Structure formats: structure tokens, C-alpha cells
Design a protein with these regions (language model features):
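Nucleotide-sugar-dependent
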Residues: 26, 86-90, 98-119, 128-139
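A charged, aromatic-enriched C-terminal amphipathic alpha-helix characteristic of glycosyltransferases
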Residues: 5, 149-197
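A short acidic/histidine/glycine-rich donor-binding loop in glycosyltransferase catalytic cores
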Residues: 139-148
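Short donor-sugar binding/catalytic loops of nucleotide-sugar-dependent glycosyltransferases
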Residues: 19-24, 55-56, 83
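Nucleotide-activated donor-binding/catalytic signature segment of Leloir-type glycosyltransferases, i.e.
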Residues: 53, 61-90, 97
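Conserved donor-binding/catalytic core segment of Leloir-type glycosyltransferases
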Residues: 7-26, 32-35, 50
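Flexible glycine/serine/alanine-rich "lid" or loop that lines and gates the nucleotide-sugar donor pocket
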Residues: 93-94, 122
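A conserved amphipathic alpha-helix that caps or lines the catalytic cleft of carbohydrate-
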Residues: 32-39, 68
């Protein structure tokens, strides 16, 4: 997984990225409703949400597309569709903060360890989510959203991100203990076979 190479200038705008085959449990509609509330105040500071991946079904389309249209968020919510390889990496380079699942409570899940959160950290991005994930809940680069139907507090997210001092490399290094190599080392040691080295 490539690490984010550049720190973008976030003094005037912030670019959020959510990568998924979008289902209702991703709760991206909560972020869009948060953006609607944010933009009602006519802020100078601009926040953009880049959704990478398809909207998986009618339910997701009905939750997301009208929320964008009715709140005139077309300039701020960008639907990229599925992207892979270099095109996906380019979007991650442009991003400043990542969006994990904000609606796992909708499917009755309170605790989950998603691969997406791990990918975001491995790429060196700070991120948000609403479920419980023991590996990240107290990480200094994670801004936890409540596990409910409230619109995401965009100003709170912006303030968190702007106060963040960790570099992409520091974020990536924090997840080394979660890597396959580190996890398999534990298994091999427990089984009494020495080490992977």
C-alpha cells in the first residue's frame, strides 16, 4: 500500500475521501448532511468529499443523490465511481482526511475491525469512523463520530484535522503491529518455531 507522499495545503480547503462500494452502513449520507449544515453558514473554508466507488443500490442512491442535489452540494461532493491502481493512488494523494464507516449501527454492528480503517492508516491518512475498533479508538489521528443518525459535525472534523501534527509516516508506523508480518510473528513465536527473520 503506497504511503501518502505530500502534505497538502489545508489553510483554505480540506479534501475528504471515502473509498467503498457504498452501502447504507457506510453512512456517507451522514457526512453529506453534515456538509449541508456546514455550507448553510456560508463558510470561507471549503470542505470537499470525494466518494470513490459505486453506489451499490437503489437505497444508497436514494440516500445520497437527493441529499447532494437538494442541498446544492454538487461542487463539494464529487462522485468518482470506481478507481483502481494509479488513479486511486492519485485521489489518495489529493486527500487530507479519510472517511470510514459512519453507519455500522444501522446493521447492528458495534464492534468491527475493518480493512478500510487499516488501509487509511497504512496510507498515512487520519480518518473518522463511528464503530468501535480497539486498534484505533484511542489513536491520536482518529476522530470518532457518534454511532447514531446525527449529521457529521464538519466544523469539529475540520478543527481536529487542522490541529493534527502527525505525519503520514508516523501514522503508517503506528500500525506496524497490525501488519501480517507482525501478526504472523506472534503465531510463529507462540508455536515455538522461532521467527520470520
Amino acid at each position: 500500500i503506497p504511503i501518502k507522499r505530500t502534505m497538502n495545503d489545508t489553510s483554505r480547503e480540506l479534501h475528504l475521501i471515502g473509498v467503498a462500494e457504498v452501502h447504507y452502513w457506510h453512512g456517507f449520507d451522514r457526512l453529506i448532511h453534515g456538509l449541508a449544515e456546514y455550507y448553510r453558514t456560508n463558510p470561507e473554508y471549503k470542505v470537499y468529499f470525494h466518494i470513490v466507488g459505486p453506489l451499490s443500490g437503489i437505497r444508497e442512491q436514494e440516500e445520497i443523490l437527493p441529499a447532494i442535489r437538494d442541498n446544492h452540494l454538487e461542487p463539494y461532493v464529487i462522485l468518482h465511481g470506481p478507481l483502481h491502481s494509479d488513479k486511486l493512488d492519485e485521489q489518495f494523494e489529493k486527500a487530507d482526511f479519510a472517511i470510514g464507516s459512519l453507519g455500522r449501527h444501522r446493521s447492528g454492528i458495534a464492534h468491527i475491525k475493518t480493512l478500510k480503517n487499516r488501509e487509511y492508516a497504512a496510507r498515512g491518512l487520519a480518518f473518522t469512523y463511528s464503530e468501535n475498533d480497539d486498534d484505533f479508538d484511542s489513536a491520536p489521528y482518529v476522530w470518532k463520530a457518534p454511532a447514531d443518525e446525527s449529521p457529521v459535525d464538519i466544523m469539529g472534523l475540520v478543527e481536529f484535522q487542522r490541529a493534527l501534527t502527525m505525519t503520514p509516516l508516523e501514522i503508517r508506523e503506528s500500525v506496524y503491529p497490525l501488519s501480517w508480518k507482525a501478526q504472523m510473528q506472534k503465531v510463529i513465536k507462540e508455536a515455538g518455531f522461532g521467527s520470520l527473520e
